[in-house]
Amino acid sequence: MARAIMFQGTASHVGKSVLTLALARVLYLDGFKVAPFKAQNMALNSYVTLDGGEMGRAQVAQAEACGLEPRVEMNPVLLKPSSDKGSQVIVLGKPIGHYSAKSYHLERRSMVWEAVKKAYETLAQEFDFIVIEGAGSPAEVNLKASDIANMKTAFLANAPVILVADIDRGGALASLVGTMELLEPEERKMVCGFILNKFRGDLELLKPALTFLEEKTGIPVLGVMPYIPELLIPEEDSVSLEETVSNREKDLKIGVVWYPRISNFTDFEIFQYEPDVELIYIKTLQDFRDDFDLVILPGSKNTVADLNYLKQRGLDQKLYAYVEKGKPLIGICGGLQILGEKILDPDLVEGKETEVKALGILDTVTEFRGDKITRRTSTRVTRADGYFFLQREEISGYEIHHGRTFLSGERSDVLDNTENPLVFARGRVLGTYLHGLFDNDFFRHRLLNRLRREKGLDGIENRPTSLKNLRQENYDKIARVFRENVNLKKIYEILGI
């Protein structure tokens, strides 16, 4: 059976995912068979495995850092919020329905926990070590009875817990001490150390606080991790989008329309590595700049709600004016559906309306169906689109959607010959169900260089290639920083190495 160790946090977004990845990568580079695990994840940013299962993106990155193909056992439960009060529940890669928080815990808690135990035991039989990531905070007293992602998992795996706090946001010492106070006595015994994450400044000035923390709690500080800029780690929720967007002036400005249920924003991850691209998220009318070279409508977990959000804020009028100028617009998955004439929902898969008028920029109609398509796929473009350089070439990506979209008029074209079309175009407007479109190097390179030439700029020939290789380089960087700033000898002692 594998030995385990777990990272829990004083709050969401303190860096549990990155530290889990870092230790997993270190163990992998040191020659051990290691796998990541997170019992339950809540995220809109998901991934499709080779066998068509859906799982959280953070565990995908952690699996890659371990040299593994991602498997749903690494994240057996995924909650994808579809409203402020409800989520689609994914268990071992497959959706089992939409539930409110209350109904989920009342109706599905025991079944879900059995799936978690089975998934963990499967991994524990195959690997030397399991590095586990918790969720949120283990000290949410109102949620503790139903919390399966933190201490319950730690007890299942007999995993010592490293408690992580984000010192960049302030209040880190209070949050560590407060979290320890709110844990039950047997839970406190599981905590083997603290890590202060995202530190900027003079470490000497921090040392008195570390001494105080150790004396106050009796728990050792295992390390102080510095703030690492421009991490290429997939974000799981839109809270952290602003931290990943460049604020530096660059030649090309790409606007990404933001809405409350934005999903799969890893579609734009590669742009972080393009030397001439500035990504700007469009939340308000004021954010919609006149000098955008390209605008993207991303995926959505609730297309109708996000369509209404755009209309209520007048962003639909901005999009009409933008397209009228002949400027390029790309919609991905939910973005494609929003660009069409209307959305049909006869079985009320997404909401309470059976028919909704969309933006009408593409001549398409989307119908939501109960069965969900989740698969990796590729399609060959069978006719040239005239602008986006798709000329009988194969593009690949993955699909996650309930909708089926078809042509409804003559102004738009289907560019591929699949049974359920994946790529639609009308002039300089492109819509597709393919997540990962921009990871196709040839497509991204040609598009960006075309945008440059339209501004009178020379193209760039040596652009980044292979997002996979870029990620691996990034994982090595994170592991190196972890080795330099964390007491790895002590952690290895805890693991019995």
From Swiss-Prot:
Residues annotated as signal peptide: none
Classification via PROSITE patterns: GATASE_COBBQ
Residue positions of the active site: 333 (nucleophile), 435
Keyword tRNA-binding attached: no
Domain GATase cobBQ-type: 251-443
Functional pathway: Cofactor biosynthesis; adenosylcobalamin biosynthesis
Underlying gene: cobQ
Family note: Belongs to the CobB/CobQ family. CobQ subfamily.
Name assigned to this protein: Cobyric acid synthase
Function according to Swiss-Prot or TrEMBL: Catalyzes amidations at positions B, D, E, and G on adenosylcobyrinic A,C-diamide. NH(2) groups are provided by glutamine, and one molecule of ATP is hydrogenolyzed for each amidation.
PANTHER family: COBYRIC ACID SYNTHASE, DETHIOBIOTIN SYNTHETASE
Pfam families: CbiA (PF01656), GATase_3 (PF07685)
NCBIfam families associated with the record: cobQ, PRK00784.1
GO biological process: cobalamin biosynthetic process
CDD domains for the chain: CobQ_N (cd05389), GATase1_CobQ (cd01750)
InterPro entries listed in its UniProt record: Class_I_gatase-like, CobQ/CobB/MinD/ParA_Nub-bd_dom, CobQ_GATase1, CobQ_N, CobQ_synth, GATase_3, P-loop_NTPase
Sample GO molecular function, one term: catalytic activity
High-level lineage: Bacteria, Bacillati, Bacillota, Clostridia, Thermoanaerobacterales
Keyword terms: Cobalamin biosynthesis, Glutamine amidotransferase
